[in-house]
Design a protein with these regions (language model features):
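A domain-start/cap signature at the N-terminus of enzymes
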Residues: 12-58, 70-76, 84-88, 156-159, ...
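Gly/Ser-rich "nucleophile elbow"/oxyanion-hole loop immediately N-terminal to the catalytic nucleophile
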Residues: 48-55, 109-196, 211
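Conserved alpha/beta-hydrolase
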Residues: 86-97
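Catalytic active-site module of serine/aspartate enzymes centered on a nucleophile-bearing elbow/loop
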Residues: 334-346
Length: 346
């Protein structure tokens, strides 16, 4: 067994690490948090089986572009499954709908605000630029906060998320708030998100400021922009479940075993993304797995085709690439059940 595998098993076997909020209770509902001079909003779900002196696992769920805190928790099946598995769920709202941007609520991750890709001028791409999109075929979505002359962030018109706040820092503050308010098992904190929220979840896993806070992550129909192929931002393994749609023209996963990047082809945009195979291979290697041909894995969900480079390490692999015959859709409720099952096994 490799050192990484040993560390993973040790993490799984570790006892609960109760937060400072043990002994306290809080009702499900809508709350606010002032962070870096900005009022942030979030919805909280507390399972009926919550006990103030028993540490519970926590999931942070990030909505997609233009969504809000009700995107996941407004779904009855999400609440029912979370209740059944005993998960506290917090769903924050991104920035963008209010002043000064008056655009779509969003989460900012590598390249999304600057408009710059992670691999610069790619010699393998004819006529390539260093942008995350083909600006000739993509509308200008730049937020006013990204065009502020006093602090310009956007390098081109491919920029498409907010520039008002550091979302990684906000996530850290949100987790600290929940940990002070409820009895959270800090060794079992997880992140998931859909579309833009899923892209931000990759950022949380790659960023050294946030990666150590999570036990596992599960991006849904969300991939990093092209060239942002960083492994987990910590030395210990970080399990990941990736769920994508093979008919998705907005954030396509690309063909199996193809390490190339993918391109939006929905008729309105041409954004470039890291392919599902490319990012899962990088994370598989970081998690101590080999890089042969991905092996099939039965996740118990008829709708999905799941494959992994991490077969044989445990009953559930640490990196799992699941694709369903669907478009740019979350696949609720089956995807939420799968996400929680993956978290249970991580």
């Amino acid at each position: 067994m490799t050192l990484l595998a040993t560390l993973a098993l040790a993490m799984q076997a570790a006892a609960a690490l109760p937060s400072r909020g043990c002994g306290k209770s809080l009702s499900s509902g809508n709350y606010t948090l002032s962070h870096a001079g900005v009022t942030r909003h979030y919805r909280l779900f507390v399972p009926t089986g919550y006990r103030a002196n028993t540490a519970s696992p926590l999931v942070v769920a990030f909505h997609g572009w233009g969504g809000n805190e009700n995107e996941f928790l407004g779904n009855a099946s999400v609440r029912a499954a979370s209740n059944r598995h005993g998960y506290i769920v917090v769903a924050p709202r991104g920035l963008g709908a209010g002043a000064p941007d008056r655009s779509y609520n969003s989460w900012t991750f590598s390249g999304s605000a600057t408009g710059l890709d992670g691999d610069g001028l790619n010699p393998a791409v004819s006529g390539d630029t260093d942008a995350i999109c083909d600006a000739r075929s993509t509308p200008d979505y730049r937020y006013p906060s990204c065009k502020n002359p006093a602090r310009p962030v956007a390098s081109n018109t491919c920029s498409w998320t907010q520039c008002r706040a550091d979302d990684v820092a906000f996530t850290r503050a949100l987790l600290a708030r929940i940990g002070r308010s409820l009895c959270v098992d800090t060794s079992r904190v997880f992140a998931t998100g859909g579309s833009n929220g899923g892209m931000f979840v990759w950022e949380l896993g790659q960023n050294t400021r946030s990666s150590p806070l999570f036990r596992a992550i599960a991006p849904v129909i969300g991939l990093p922009h092209r060239g942002y192929l960083a492994p987990p931002g910590r030395s210990q393994p970080l399990p990941v479940l990736l769920i994508t749609g093979t008919q998705d023209t907005t954030v396509p996963p690309g063909p199996w075993e193809n390490p190339g990047f993918t391109t939006t082809s929905n008729g309105s945009d041409r954004f470039f993304y890291t392919g599902a195979t490319a990012i899962t291979r990088v994370w598989s290697k970081a998690n101590g797995c080999g890089l042969g041909t991905a092996a099939p894995f039965d996740d118990g969900v008829a709708a999905t085709d799941c494959r992994t480079y991490c077969a044989g390490f445990s009953s559930w692999p640490r990196v799992l690439d699941c694709r369903a015959s669907m478009g740019h859709d979350y696949g609720l409720p089956w995807s939420w059940n799968l996400v929680l099952e993956f978290f249970n096994r991580s």
